[in-house]
Amino acid sequence: MKMILAVAAGGGLGAVARYLTGVGLGHWLGTAYPWATMTVNVTGSFAMGVLAGLGAHVWQPAPELRAFLMVGVLGGFTTFSSFSLDVALLVERGAIGAAAAYVAASFLLSVGGLFAGLALIRTAVA
């Protein structure tokens, strides 16, 4: 039961952070392009890389804390379901080039963010 509560609490925090990121970036950059979704996926992937790197090298958190952060907070913060919807909306608006660029940039930057997080921790603990 502790594990479920940890994931639920983290998921709530992550979802609120995602929402606030969307509101903030929407005001700053506009909503014609899905900047908020790409931002949460890239930064969330970077954070996942940092946490995974820490867990592999220097930090052994309790299973509940690990689940709270990685499954809950980051699971609620990042979102590929919204990513898929954003792609579909761009395609349906006829913005095929923007949709393709969004898919490529999101994938490359998210995976790159994870590797950057891992590299940061590997360098810091070396």
Curated annotation (Swiss-Prot):
Q: Describe regulators of its activity.
A: Na(+) is not transported, but it plays an essential structural role and its presence is essential for fluoride channel function.
Classify the source by domain of life.
Answer: Bacteria
The reply on keyword Cell inner membrane is yes
Keyword terms: Cell inner membrane, Cell membrane, Ion channel, Ion transport, Membrane, Metal-binding, Sodium, Transmembrane, Transmembrane helix, Transport
Q: List the Gene Ontology MF annotations in alphabetical order.
A: fluoride channel activity; metal ion binding
Q: Which GO terms describe its cellular component?
A: plasma membrane
Q: Where in the cell is it found?
A: Cell inner membrane
Where is Na(+) bound in this sequence?
Answer: 75, 78
Q: Which InterPro entries match?
A: FluC
**Catalytic reaction equation(s):** fluoride(in) = fluoride(out)
- Transmembrane portions of the chain: 3-23, 39-59, 71-91, 101-121
- Can you supply a Gene Ontology BP term from the record? cellular detoxification of fluoride
Q: How does it sit in the membrane?
A: Multi-pass membrane protein
Q: Which family does it belong to?
A: Belongs to the fluoride channel Fluc/FEX (TC 1.A.43) family.
Described function: Fluoride-specific ion channel. Important for reducing fluoride concentration in the cell, thus reducing its toxicity.
Recorded protein name is Fluoride-specific ion channel FluC
Gene (UniProt): fluC
